[in-house]
A protein has these predicted regions:
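Conserved structural-core and active-site-/substrate-pathway-adjacent residues in large, well-folded domains
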Residues: 15, 82, 126, 151, ...
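Membrane-helix entry/capping segments
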Residues: 1-8, 12-17, 21, 235-281, ...
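Short, strongly hydrophobic transmembrane alpha-helices
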Residues: 10, 14-46, 57
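Alpha-helical transmembrane segments of integral membrane proteins
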Residues: 21-35, 272-292
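Mid-to-C-terminal secondary-structure elements
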Residues: 121-137, 146-266
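Structured, solvent-exposed hinge/loop segments at the ends of secondary-structure elements
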Residues: 36-165, 170-178
Length: 313
């Protein structure tokens, strides 16, 4: 027993002399773990946009797909068809394509202009997004066609407070000036989003757009907990009059920035997945190297111990 303890102490002394190998191995393992943590976090972030919205995994963008094209730009009349076909299966909302930021200001302070991102959407769309109302109500917004919804930050920029329902706001939209009344204030977009907005304006539809077969200015979003079933139901929506070979499909809002062009998951997230795979290999190799170093040191001492025993030491 005394000889075994003596050789164990010798092994520890050997470890001290070969400590640089152990240190390098530990540092390598630590670096590989950091890389793995970063890569997993990167992949999670890129696949979970709009995670601040309640039930964000149930939000899907409706897209048209055929052999030539994959797009989210749809005809207005398809929105009514989607809503009619899905019924109680899913919540349906419509919104326009978003352009750049536009100018807003208060009627009594035209010299103070703010640039803000507009979302022109139906009232159903606001409810579908799960916006938490801080002031006012969505019922007030739905009751009139000139009510807008401000985010908390936008309300504070314009008025310095959030209890601003009934106040007026001017919006300069391209060649025209619009006067709105604030109907509600909702929480901000608190993170990365595929549908960022500073204020939500009414979805006004021009007469030529309602039954148009060429003005694809609208987008449709649905909230459903059963996407496979909902997508199957979308096959019943008649779009053959405009696209005989087309069909409607669902793309998760949280991954729309990567998969909105029709790309599959692996193709869309190739770099993130590759980085995770490389990081896993680094961790595995670092663990193997660490075990090899420590095993080599202690096995050397064990062989020395066995040799001493065989020589009768």
């Amino acid at each position: 027993m005394g000889l075994w303890i003596q050789n164990f102490k010798q092994a520890l002394r050997g470890l001290r002399h070969q400590g640089w190998q152990a240190v390098v191995s530990v540092v390598g393992l630590a670096v590989s773990i950091v890389c793995l943590t970063f890569s997993v976090n990167w992949l999670w972030t890129e696949t979970h946009y709009d995670s601040f919205r309640p039930g964000y995994k149930d939000l899907y963008v409706v897209e048209r797909e055929d052999s030539l094209e994959h797009t989210e730009s749809l005809l207005y009349r398809w929105g009514d068809r989607v809503s009619s076909v899905l019924g109680e299966e899913a919540m349906v909302g419509m919104y326009r394509y978003q352009g750049g930021r536009e100018r807003v200001y208060l009627p009594d302070r035209p010299e103070t202009v703010f640039y803000a991102q507009e979302l022109s959407a139906s009232t159903e769309m606001v409810a579908l997004l799960g916006c938490r109302v801080l002031s006012g109500s969505l019922e007030e917004v739905a009751a009139a066609d000139n009510r807008i919804v401000l985010t908390e930050t936008m309300a504070r920029k314009l008025f310095g407070r959030i209890d601003v329902c009934g106040e007026s706001v001017c919006h300069i939209q391209k060649w025209r000036q619009l006067l709105y009344t604030v109907g509600a204030v909702v929480e901000d977009c608190r993170g990365k989003s595929n549908l960022h907005y500073d204020f939500i304006s009414p979805l006004w539809v021009e007469d030529y757009e309602r039954n148009s077969a060429v003005h694809e200015n609208f987008r449709i979003m649905v909230r459903t907990s059963r996407p496979e079933r909902t997508e199957s139901e979308l096959s019943r929506v008649d779009i053959k009059d405009s696209y005989p070979m087309g069909k409607l499909v669902l793309t998760p809002l949280r991954m729309f920035h990567k998969m909105g062009d029709g790309s599959g998951f692996v193709r869309a997230y190739f770099y993130q997945l590759a980085f995770v795979a490389v990081s896993l290999l680094l961790v595995l190799s670092a663990v193997v190297n660490l075990l090899a170093v420590y095993t080599s040191i202690f096995l050397g001492r064990i062989r020395e111990y066995a040799l001493r025993r065989s020589l009768g030491a």
